[in-house]
Curated annotation (Swiss-Prot):
<dbReference type="InterPro" id="IPR041988">
    <property type="entry name" value="Ribosomal_uL24_KOW"/>
</dbReference>
<dbReference type="InterPro" id="IPR008991">
    <property type="entry name" value="Translation_prot_SH3-like_sf"/>
</dbReference>
<dbReference type="InterPro" id="IPR003256">
    <property type="entry name" value="Ribosomal_uL24"/>
</dbReference>
<dbReference type="InterPro" id="IPR005824">
    <property type="entry name" value="KOW"/>
</dbReference>
<protein>
    <recommendedName>
        <fullName>Large ribosomal subunit protein uL24</fullName>
    </recommendedName>
</protein>
<comment type="similarity">
    <text>Belongs to the universal ribosomal protein uL24 family.</text>
</comment>
<dbReference type="GO" id="GO:0019843">
    <property type="term" value="F:rRNA binding"/>
</dbReference>
<dbReference type="InterPro" id="IPR014722">
    <property type="entry name" value="Rib_uL2_dom2"/>
</dbReference>
<keyword id="KW-0694">RNA-binding</keyword>
<keyword id="KW-0689">Ribosomal protein</keyword>
<keyword id="KW-0687">Ribonucleoprotein</keyword>
<comment type="function">
    <text>One of the proteins that surrounds the polypeptide exit tunnel on the outside of the subunit.</text>
</comment>
<dbReference type="GO" id="GO:0022625">
    <property type="term" value="C:cytosolic large ribosomal subunit"/>
</dbReference>
<comment type="function">
    <text>One of two assembly initiator proteins, it binds directly to the 5'-end of the 23S rRNA, where it nucleates assembly of the 50S subunit.</text>
</comment>
<dbReference type="Pfam" id="PF00467">
    <property type="entry name" value="KOW"/>
</dbReference>
<dbReference type="GO" id="GO:0003735">
    <property type="term" value="F:structural constituent of ribosome"/>
</dbReference>
<dbReference type="InterPro" id="IPR005825">
    <property type="entry name" value="Ribosomal_uL24_CS"/>
</dbReference>
Length: 104
C-alpha cells in the first residue's frame, strides 16, 4: 500500500488528548500503521543513567495511529489524501478537498 502520510508532512490530530494540534511527521512506521509527530502525544520515560547520557525523566513522542491524523493542505485545513497518475506515468499524491498536487 502506498503511503498517504510521509516524513516531513504537516498533519493535524483528529482524536485524543492532542485533538486539533498540528505538527510535522518525523518518522512513519507503515508495518505498525503509526507515525511519530514532533511535539504531539508526548509521554514521560524514566531514563537509566549511562556513560553517554544522564539519567532522569525525559519527555519523548509516542507513536500515533495514522487513522488519527490528517494531512494539512496548503490552505491550512485538514484533507484526505489520494493518488493520481500523471500523463507521463508518474504517481503523485493529491489533496482530495482541493485536487492540488501535494508532491510532484
Amino acid at each position: 500500500m502506498a503511503a498517504k502520510i510521509r516524513k516531513g508532512d504537516k498533519v493535524v490530530v483528529l482524536t485524543g488528548r492532542d485533538k486539533g494540534r498540528t505538527g510535522e511527521v518525523f518518522e512513519v512506521r507503515p508495518d505498525a500503521g503509526t507515525a511519530l509527530v514532533r511535539g504531539i502525544n508526548m509521554v514521560k520515560r524514566h531514563q537509566k543513567q549511562t556513560q553517554a547520557q544522564e539519567g532522569g525523566i525525559i519527555s519523548k513522542e509516542a507513536p500515533i495511529q495514522l487513522s488519527n491524523i490528517a494531512y494539512v493542505g496548503k490552505d491550512g485545513k485538514p484533507t484526505r489524501v489520494g493518488f493520481k497518475i500523471l500523463a507521463d506515468g508518474k504517481k503523485v499524491r493529491i489533496a482530495k478537498s482541493s485536487g492540488a498536487e501535494i508532491d510532484g
